[in-house]
Design a protein with these regions (language model features):
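Structured alpha/beta or helical-core interaction and ligand-binding surfaces enriched in interleaved
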Residues: 1-164, 169-185
């Protein structure tokens, strides 16, 4: 884990992702419904990284707020996202919005407290959790610290607002990140 710490903490600025030393940019889909944007964004990741998708893991510092409203989606979409939301809570990928995480997000206490982070190596759920963070952002999911990290390719992707994904190179060679963003454009 020490080698990963070198990548994470030197290359990702947790206070301002676009100020990260390896920040390359972000992509988003235009003129689509929110649901379409979310799904298209994940499909782009799956398509581009199809040969290395299993090398990704998820690093989050997200909280849940059960009292918040649900965004306007179809009944089928709400059913899907509620299922993912409950699974994320059960797996500890979303933690209760209180204590240290509340202090961090409410008072902007820095530096970023590493002990509020969660990891998931469950390949079948990591993209669903990213989609959830976009769909329920500013509602039932609190925070925006959600990273898909591929240590082999030395790249970190994060849900960018509710429109796509941002891209941070975890090495001085940004070519893979640039190639990915060009693929998405």
């Amino acid at each position: 884990m020490e080698i990963y710490n070198k990548y994470f903490f030197n290359k990702i600025n947790f206070n301002s992702f676009s100020s990260s030393p390896g920040w390359v940019g972000y992509f988003y889909a235009r003129d689509l419904t929110m649901q379409s944007v979310i799904q298209m964004s994940s499909k782009m990741i799956e398509s581009f990284f199809k040969d290395s998708i299993n090398d990704f893991f998820l690093l989050t510092a997200l909280a849940y707020d059960d009292s918040a409203s649900i965004p306007e989606f179809s009944d089928l979409e709400v059913s899907y996202y509620e299922s993912v939301y409950n699974k994320a809570k059960e797996m500890g990928m979303l933690i209760p919005y209180n204590g240290l995480i509340e202090d961090f997000y409410e008072d902007n206490k820095y530096p970023f407290p590493a002990n509020i982070m969660s990891l998931s190596f469950d390949k079948k759920d990591i993209l669903s959790f990213c989609e959830l963070s976009m769909a329920y952002k500013y509602n039932k999911v609190v925070g925006d610290h959600c990273f898909l990290i591929n240590p082999t390719l030395k790249i970190a992707l994060y849900p960018h607002e509710d429109i796509g994904y941002g891209c941070i190179s975890l090495s001085d060679d940004c070519s893979k990140a640039i190639e990915f963003l060009n693929f998405c454009s």
